[in-house]
Amino acid sequence: MEVPFTIPGDQVNAILYKKTKDKYLSRLSKVTMPSNNRIDALCMHFGSCGGCCWQQLPYELQLKQKEKSIQNLFKPYLNENVKWHSIIPSSPWHYRNKMELTFSSDKAGRRYLGLIMQGTRGHVFQMKECLLANGWFAQAARAIQKWWDNSDVQAYHAIKDRGSLRTLTLREGLRTGDRLVMLTVSGNPDYALTKSQLQSFVQVLRDSIELSNSDQKLSVFLRIQQIAKGRPTNFYEMLLYGPDHIREKLYLPDFNEAIQTLNFRISPSAFFQPNTEQAEKLYSQALKLADLSASHVVYDLYCGTGTLGICSAKYVKEVIGIELSRESVLDARENVKENGLSNVTIKSGDVGQVLEALSQENSLKPDVVMVDPPRIGLDAKAIKHILDLKAPKLVYISCNPKTQVMNLGPLIDGGYQLQIVQPVDQFPQTVHVENITLLTLP
């Protein structure tokens, strides 16, 4: 049974509302006797927000629970030949560099800009604070709420295809102080925002978002989400103010304990790890497990903005990154230039198709394959291509260990052996955990 907002040792009253294949889903009604480990949550929205569910659990116990969950998942593969590394902790608060808020209104006309309520399908509550992100996120949200309240612009209603405002995306470069705001609106031309409305939107942000020095930049985007029955959803982005990207730096400890500084540009919709400090630990650990050398050729699959491959470029002969998202590919190529790297090539396209093309081109075979796929994990076609590469080392980073462990079966059947499991906590106060595995061919 799953009961959100509880911890081991709590005695509670819960309301069952759904049975799935392997568990009951329920809502917490009352904690009749709290666990001795229970603490008070810090956030005023805890219990209604769908973002956090573990603020009532001390952080050291959160880490133990996450380690336990990974151990349970990987139990069929853990033996005396597999090294288990303790979970790498994170700063528990104010770690997120990106948030997406939703516009909504109720039948009475009340307007809400915030996060989705826990256990609901799209019900939004008014966000006044979020302790997982920098304080300016909530400050900007309050300013936009005021702008919206003083306008006749409507929140988008998906069923009726009416209204304009869908989401508000907030991003920052932790190391640079750059800030980005993107307003996503519907593609229904009957509800298009006017030029004056967009100008006032930008001005509100310029007035409310404080930049501490002239090197810090603010970027404001409009994104139009075009939906039509029987057709794929299309997005069109328009720069309203500032640079067309934000900048970020990663500080990675070198193998000789010096610090390697790497520069990255991030477009509004491109993927970048949402916890910057923890991304540095994640990538450093991945490079350490790969045990790279100057003769190595590295394939970085699902490379996003090229981060992992760029981090490894200094230590190897050649890096080939593969990414499907065109926007991420453009960023990745710019990031390669930004860091002055001549041994990194970014290929655009489906991983399986690009790998097939590389094999036909007789490109250099990889010594190390690194994969960081989306939550759905590797599909059967991608696994087949990875097995065909026969790389001696495979470093698999996952934001969803459940699909990662599902992928282990066919990889091990294909000849790989699991060597190391390394959990990394990217998202304190939540159940989510990142995981790195090292697999090798005998």
From Swiss-Prot:
Domain of life: Bacteria
Entry binding sites for S-adenosyl-L-methionine: Q273, Y302, E323, D372
GO molecular function, one term: 4 iron, 4 sulfur cluster binding
Residues annotated as binding [4Fe-4S] cluster: C43, C49, C52, C130
PROSITE patterns: SAM_MT_RNA_M5U, TRMA_1, TRMA_2
EC number(s) stated in the UniProt entry for this protein: 2.1.1.-
InterPro entries: MeTrfase_TrmA_AS (IPR030390), MeTrfase_TrmA_CS (IPR030391), NA-bd_OB-fold (IPR012340), SAM-dependent_MTases_sf (IPR029063), U5_MeTrfase_fam (IPR010280)
CDD domains associated with the record: AdoMet_MTases
Keyword vocabulary terms for this entry: 4Fe-4S, Iron, Iron-sulfur, Metal-binding, Methyltransferase, S-adenosyl-L-methionine, Transferase
Active site location: C399
Gene3D superfamilies for the chain: 2.40.50.1070, Nucleic acid-binding proteins, Vaccinia Virus protein VP39
Family statement drawn from the similarity comment of this UniProt entry: Belongs to the class I-like SAM-binding methyltransferase superfamily. RNA M5U methyltransferase family.
Name of this protein: Uncharacterized RNA methyltransferase pc1544
Species annotation: Protochlamydia amoebophila (strain UWE25)
